[in-house]
Every structure is written in C-alpha cells, then in structure tokens.
C-alpha cells in the first residue's frame, strides 16, 4: 500500500493512501489507538486555542472523540459535547442536522440531546475535528450549534486537507495534500511553479 509521511505535532506518521474515486485519493489520518499522537495534537491545538474565547468544545462522532477528550483533560474542562451520528434512547427531544463527509457515503445526520443543546444555548463553542476537507462536517456542526442557540467561537483541526488549507476561518496544525491514483500529490490551485515541479 502507498503511504504518505505526515509530520504533525512533532511526530511523523505514515498515512495509507486510500481511494475515493478513480483519480482522487486521500491520506487516511486515524488517531484511534495512537495515544502519543492524540496527546501531542491535543497539546498543540490548545496552544492555538489560547487566543480564542470559548466556553465549551464540540466535535462530531467518531474519529475526533479521543482528541477532544484529551483536549478537555489537558485544559481542565469538565464538559465537552459530541454530536452523535444517530439518536440515542437516552437523548431527550434531540435536535439534528444533515452532514456530508468525504469519507462517508451518502448523507448522514448529527444529533444532540436537548439537555446538551440547553447547555450550549447562549454559550461560545469551539468546534474541533481531526481533519477538515470539504467542510461538510464542519458546516453541519456550525448549524447544530446555531440550532441549539449557541455561537461558534472558532474552528480547528489537526489537519486541513486539500484546498481547506486556504481557508482563513480555521486553525490547523498542518496541511494534508490529496493524491492521484499513482500516489503523487495532486496540484493545489495556489501551488507555486516550484511546488508543482517537486510533485511531478
């Protein structure tokens, strides 16, 4: 399997390059089971968050759960929120929004219980994700926060994939390119001529 060496938070991980379409491949960044990476990324994201004024952290199920838990642990936060991919029997009167993700086929939904929504109401929420790519999941979380009556204080991720690195409304630790079928890095719209040559 082709891999890509990802340098982030002072560590290096070889990401498997996985097929999305015939000529569009992505590097699979998985934090599950990697305690060292999770701790390091949480530490560095909290450094980026120091200038932000927020009350709570929120992420979407599931890959970012270890990350947001570690961020809460390191910062001493007693509460954070997880937008779930399905309603649970213990969720009173849940609210929901649609979510489209590059790594998930079709349309899915994100849910918050009314109890969590009531805590978010009137509060400033920092949205956290492992990877921001098309921005579909990010937009869904923003909509969920607004639906609960909160405001988005900031948006951050470990990696910004593809053109997401050009967004000026997110904070991230490192850019992650996308790839062609042969493993070469795809050309970004804003690459310099020197960068293009290095990828050929």
Regions flagged by a language model, labelled:
Residues 39-105:
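Conserved PRPP/pyrophosphate-binding segment of the phosphoribosyltransferase/PRPP-pathway fold
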Residues 1-54:
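Active-site-facing substrate-recognition patch
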Residues 3-5, 139-200:
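PRPP-dependent phosphoribosyltransferase catalytic core
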